Amino acid sequence: MKLSQVPLKEIECAGPVMRASTPYILEYAEVASLAEDLFETYRSKINHAATKLGPRQRESNAESYALLGPDRELGHFHVVYDVDETRLAIELSDDEADKFYRLMRDQRIITPDLGLIRRVMSGNMAETVAAMLWQIGAIKVTLGDLRPLYKVDEGRNYSPIYIDVKGLASYPEVNDFVLSSAALLVRNLDFDVVCGIESGSIAIAAVMAQKLAKPMFYARRARRYPEASPFEGIKSHELFRKRVLLVDDTLVHGWTKTRVIREIREWGARVEACFVIFDRQQQGSTDLEQAGVKLDSLTNRDAALSPKIPREISFLTDEEYEEVVRYFADPGAWHAAHGYTFHEPSPLD
């Protein structure tokens, strides 16, 4: 059994101990192979000085393994077989326990809980939506030590944070709350038709259009052949002089959106408003403003990093929070500090 296969019901890290539990009663053979894989993960990703896994020590309904170095014990892996779950604990140094926590937190069983969010925080709508995105794992963070940094700006630059809301539909309660809130936000805008962008925002645009009782079409990312229409779901004469609300999942620089805006206008329609679920606040709104389009967003990076969102919702560590803040404050300096060349974002590069 691989460590990455274990679904976790709970996970926490306090000092030198990372604790987790799975709702499954693991078999002895599964735990034995799990311990082997845990040790290999520890040696390859966290402490190259580790030499071997100690023998299993069993007592009553628990067992443990020592993680051994050349001349001493480096830590321990404990397993407790409970009535309806298997509890796991890893004892290491504070720093190493934190790394194991960051490795394993994405394996938690995601159970969206809007009630919990409302109980533990008192934020505005943007902060509440951001908390829900954290809760379902739509916002991801890496320091680059255990998992690679994310590539952005068409693969030319790096980022410690990635926002992916394409999985909203996997969580119906969250999806309904977020898109109902989105429809409420744009209901007073003047538009006749909703336009999504292939492929990330097609589902978002379709649900919003349904809630707003408006027709919907979508723009292609690229034409498959020169004569192909840039749009699907609408004909040229149907778009003539229509007011279009452009909808997308996230906004970084706005290059794709300004291209779509230009193509819509070439078909004789008007575009004066754009809506996104998440705005990374990296000058994308300025790009849209220069194109004569006003941006509305449901949430953004400021809301996602709000101190009102507790760590039991975001699962973010202090080190990760500080890393993301440094990145957004000055991406160029952040790249230099990590030994990377920063390429000034430009759609013409």
Residue ranges and their predicted role:
Residues M1-V247, L251-D349:
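PRPP-associated nucleotide enzymes
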